[in-house]
Amino acid sequence: MENISKEVESNDIKIDKFFEVAKVIIYSIIGIVVFFIPVTIDNQTKTILHHITYKLQVNYRGLLQLCTIVYITIGVIKSTLSKHKSNLKKIYSYFSIFSIFIVISIFYDKYSIVLLDDNISLILEETILNLITLLPLSAIFMPFILDFGLMDIVEAYCHKLMKKLFNLSGKSVLNIIMYIFNDCFCGYFMTNLLYKKGQIRQREACIILLNFSIASVSISNYIAEELNINKVNFFILSMFILILVNTILCRTYPINKKKKSYYIKTNYKESYFKSDKLINSINKHIQNKEDINIFKSMIKNFEESIHIIIRLIPNLVLIMYLGNIIINNINIIYDLKIVFSYILEILRFDNIDEISVFLVNGFFNDIIAIDLLKKNIGYTSKLLIGIICILKCTSITTNILYLETTNIPINKIEFLISYILRIILILLISYMIIYLYSIYTI
């Protein structure tokens, strides 16, 4: 009887393990397909997440616009009722009421109160609609990526390489790919989620936010088409320079001042397996897994994404509005571009004025900087601008804006320093590549 009982118990364990392994495989495939696999529907090739986003924006645009106004109103009310440490923040919170009228004007074109360029109005509208659709959708599906073993599998295969190159754990690869295949806000959400759950260190979160929040594939395609440059050369050069630049910047200020500790203490441990990586990583997940209800996890992520949107939209609208005034002021742009003009002159680049103005505008917003760029410049200058646009990783309307909603300790000065160092490195490496190419072709 004892033998029969043990045999039954053993069979039960095997069946339970089979179902756990099946869950890891099925949920991981769902996550990969939703976030990372391009699918062609209606002659458009994009990820399933982007297809759903597109359908929502086309079929329910009016509802999304109404939701935006509700979100921004809630955000403004919360901001004005909050206790602010400084009078400046208090004044800004009252000024944020103006953002409601700006959005209504953009959506319904009924008021002449908004003095925005048509281009910037269009960019702002598309940014807001993408934010309120793509971010909640990605938040809903995020548990398939984070909670059911895919992170452990990726870490097992990529940990050694990522640690040597960038001082990152192997699981960071998934977060970086999230930026590339979706958009920066989805990437920021995932970075902060990993940090809050105690799965990446403070330093790793800062590295990803400052050095790997690169432009998505769709934005990169847009840049290549707008600048009329060869996409293959453009992407290969960009990835090569990205690896070189990040290998250096992941070991310099402000990254080297960040802690190696986790946000919270958990049982999670990084692991690297020399053999049987797939089997060992799945076993590791099964042994350390928490009892997670996927539907509760989806709802929790969705709620968090809505709270983020409510905080982001009023600030995004005001920053775009004020930024429009600044970038149209020739004197301000002239004063700011001097720093970059000096570096470009030393390296003897062509089209110095155009590139330096782009670098100033790019710190505000990539798409606006590309739209304002004079396109009658040399091919090398266009290629350089495109590479910078993909790799610079910092702008006021993206990660600096999003920082207010995260637990990641990076201040605005560190963002600015990181941006300047990054631009200088990209320019130096680009100069060396151009110089070596010119010698080779002689």
Which sequence ranges carry the predicted segments?
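Intrinsically disordered, low-complexity non-transmembrane regions of multi-pass membrane transporters
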Residues: 1-28, 256-305
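Hydrophobic core segments of alpha-helical transmembrane domains in multi-pass membrane transport
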Residues: 25-39, 64-79, 96-109, 135-143, ...
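C-terminal transmembrane helix pair
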Residues: 26-31, 200-224, 243-245, 366-442
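Transmembrane alpha-helix boundary signature
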Residues: 77-85, 104-119, 148
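Hydrophobic alpha-helical transmembrane segments of multi-pass integral membrane proteins
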Residues: 134-147, 164-187, 319, 341-373
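Hydrophobic transmembrane alpha-helices that form the pore/transport pathway of multi-pass ion
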Residues: 145-213, 371-380
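Juxtamembrane inter-helical linkers in multi-pass membrane proteins
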Residues: 156-183, 259-296, 342-351
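Transmembrane helical segments that form the transport core of multi-pass membrane transport proteins
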Residues: 287-377
